């Protein structure tokens, strides 16, 4: 269908469900960061993202269309299971570092990735680890993506008995 047949509006490319999940993961990391740094509550941040950010334009930046249920599942699951997630992350760090020493964005990435490894058995470990390493690359240029890869890989081995292949 041409633009003219569509009322003159250009057609929007469809977003594949996998890409919507990736966008939901990125948004979840951003929401978890916002909660960690700003002290925002889970209900407030989820409502804000669903109403004003997911698939919307904010201050000239267009947020990708995201799977809202995937986003909600990650954010609320990390908050609900944080007492289970944080010890796993701490034990996977090579040195005895408290999570508070990690950058808040790295903390959010590791918590979200760990939640998915624990809860989303339908998603292969390789997909989870790769997605969160890519999110780390969007924020960092140096060692942080390697750290995310190593920590999530160790957690996957411990929890699922498998590593990223």
UniProtKB/Swiss-Prot annotation:
GO MF, one example: RNA binding
GO cellular component, as recorded: cytosol
Keyword Protein transport: no
Region (Disordered): 1-20
Pfam families, per database record: NusB
One of the GO BP terms on file: DNA-templated transcription termination
Keywords: RNA-binding, Transcription, Transcription antitermination, Transcription regulation
Family in the record: Belongs to the NusB family.
Function: Involved in transcription antitermination. Required for transcription of ribosomal RNA (rRNA) genes. Binds specifically to the boxA antiterminator sequence of the ribosomal RNA (rrn) operons.
Database matches in NCBIfam families: nusB (TIGR01951)
Name by which UniProt lists this protein: Transcription antitermination protein NusB
Species the sequence originates in: Agrobacterium fabrum (strain C58 / ATCC 33970)
Gene: nusB
